[in-house]
């Protein structure tokens, strides 16, 4: 017996509308790359070369940019490193092309930041270290007067950088790390997402006072649960204050290998699925170029950016009528250059046609030794399994959607 009202049938769409609309933000320009608002989620990474080695740094930046990192960050721990950025930028222009660059500045870094701002498009600071408070052994609390004194020192120290970036039309990232909160934040809020958010807010409010809004925020942690809580809280807190700055997402120190990728996908992907996040960096203990495919894979899985063929394939079961794993690899090898297509490879007709209904093309086991080719939901032809992959290629060609793969040379 039916006990619930029948819901209205939704209009069929190629992809469902997101459950969580994307968080509205300002647009922040980093050279010619736009972050936030409705612009595509930006992928970025960081070189691991010493910035003082100009040739090595230029080579590292170029490798990352060619791999798909749209913005590249470099570490700038000293004034000498800051001055080296001038030569790095010039050599990039001479030997490659301009690349949007971010300088990473940490401990008591105002002089370094003011210098390097001349040569980069964005400066990243860590609020817990930028105006460094040396921990005092035995301290049990901060008085309100002490708290305000440090806040005034931060305003006095930080404001010149804000004014410089505003005058040069450059960007700032206020990048909080869970592991480096200032001592007074730890005393006041504990080692919590609240402390992370308040740490960023202190600096963001100074930017707002100076009418400088070319600001990106990040709240990174090595544990996805902590970073998820921090970003969600930050979205509520900053938006309530009208400081709708874009967010840079990342699980810091995610590690390496499969597990590092899983941690990054869980943290970054969950927030993106909730509509939170405007630029991402996957942090792996590997060559930086290996971070880039993971980042684009996360975006592809959420249908936020399409940079490869989307393959739909069942896990195989007793009903499968051909060697699914082998055939999928053959189909992938033949079609992986056709960026933008969705291709389904399904083992049988029980779930195949329904599960692949939104794919552009389908390859489905029909009977032993015979496969069916689909264009969308329409079965086009049945061919012997031995001819299946070539028949799929011919179908794509007949539809005018085939391009030859790029030359290996």
From Swiss-Prot:
Amino acid composition bias (Polar residues), ranges on this chain: 1-12
Reaction(s) catalysed by this chain's protein: (2E)-4-hydroxy-3-methylbut-2-enyl diphosphate + 2 oxidized [2Fe-2S]-[ferredoxin] + H2O = 2-C-methyl-D-erythritol 2,4-cyclic diphosphate + 2 reduced [2Fe-2S]-[ferredoxin] + H(+)
Note describing how the cofactor binds: Binds 1 [4Fe-4S] cluster.
Keywords associated with the record: 4Fe-4S, Iron, Iron-sulfur, Isoprene biosynthesis, Metal-binding, Oxidoreductase
GO molecular function, one term: 4-hydroxy-3-methylbut-2-en-1-yl diphosphate synthase activity (ferredoxin)
Needed co-factor(s): [4Fe-4S] cluster
An annotated GO BP: terpenoid biosynthetic process
Domain of life: Bacteria
Stretches the record annotates as Disordered: 1-22
Pathway where this protein functions: Isoprenoid biosynthesis; isopentenyl diphosphate biosynthesis via DXP pathway; isopentenyl diphosphate from 1-deoxy-D-xylulose 5-phosphate: step 5/6
Matching SUPFAM superfamilies: Nitrite and sulphite reductase 4Fe-4S domain-like (SSF56014)
EC number: 1.17.7.1
Binding site for [4Fe-4S] cluster: 314, 317, 348, 355
Family: Belongs to the IspG family.
Function: Converts 2C-methyl-D-erythritol 2,4-cyclodiphosphate (ME-2,4cPP) into 1-hydroxy-2-methyl-2-(E)-butenyl 4-diphosphate.
Protein's name in the database: 4-hydroxy-3-methylbut-2-en-1-yl diphosphate synthase (ferredoxin)
Organism the protein comes from: Synechococcus sp. (strain JA-2-3B'a(2-13)) (Cyanobacteria bacterium Yellowstone B-Prime)
UniProt lineage: Bacteria, Bacillati, Cyanobacteriota, Cyanophyceae, Synechococcales
């Amino acid at each position: 017996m039916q006990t619930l009202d029948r819901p209205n049938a939704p209009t069929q769409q190629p992809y469902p509308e997101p459950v969580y609309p994307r968080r509205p933000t300002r647009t922040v320009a980093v050279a010619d790359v736009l972050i936030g608002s409705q612009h595509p989620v930006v992928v970025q990474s960081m070189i691991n070369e010493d910035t003082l080695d100009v040739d090595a740094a230029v080579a590292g930046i170029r490798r990352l940019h060619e791999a798909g990192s749209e913005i590249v960050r470099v570490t700038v721990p000293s004034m000498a490193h800051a001055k080296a950025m001038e030569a790095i930028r010039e050599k990039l222009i001479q030997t490659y092309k301009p690349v949007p660059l971010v300088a990473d500045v940490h401990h008591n870094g105002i002089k370094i930041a003011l210098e390097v701002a001349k040569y980069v498009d964005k400066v990243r600071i860590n609020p817990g270290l930028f105006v460094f408070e040396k921990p005092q052994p035995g301290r049990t609390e901060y008085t309100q007067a002490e708290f305000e004194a440090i806040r005034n020192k931060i305003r006095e120290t930080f404001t010149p950088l804000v004014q410089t970036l505003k005058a040069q039309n450059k960007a700032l990232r206020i990048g909080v790390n869970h592991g480096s909160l200032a001592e007074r934040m730890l005393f006041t809020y504990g080692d919590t997402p609240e402390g992370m958010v308040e740490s960023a807010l202190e600096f963001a409010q100074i930017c707002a006072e100076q009418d400088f809004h070319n600001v990106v925020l990040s709240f990174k942690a090595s544990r996805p649960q902590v970073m998820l809580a921090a970003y969600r809280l930050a979205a509520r807190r900053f938006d309530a204050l009208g400081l709708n700055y874009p967010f840079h997402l990342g699980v810091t120190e995610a590690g390496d290998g499969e597990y590092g990728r899983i941690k990054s996908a869980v943290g970054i992907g969950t927030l993106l699925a909730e509509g939170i996040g405007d630029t991402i960096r996957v942090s792996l203990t590997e060559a930086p170029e290996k971070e880039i495919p993971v980042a684009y894979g996360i975006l592809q899985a959420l249908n936020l950016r399409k940079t490869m063929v989307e393959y739909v394939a069942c896990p195989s079961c007793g009903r499968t009528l051909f060697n699914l794993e082998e055939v999928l690899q053959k189909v992938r090898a033949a079609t992986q250059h056709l960026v933008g297509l969705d291709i389904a490879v399904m083992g049988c007709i029980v779930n195949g046609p329904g599960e692949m209904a939104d794919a552009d093309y389908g390859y489905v086991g029909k009977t032993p030794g015979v496969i069916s080719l689909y264009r969308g939901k329409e079965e086009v032809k049945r061919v012997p399994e031995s001819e299946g992959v070539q028949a799929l290629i011919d179908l794509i060609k007949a539809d005018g959607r085939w391009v030859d793969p790029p030359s290996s040379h």
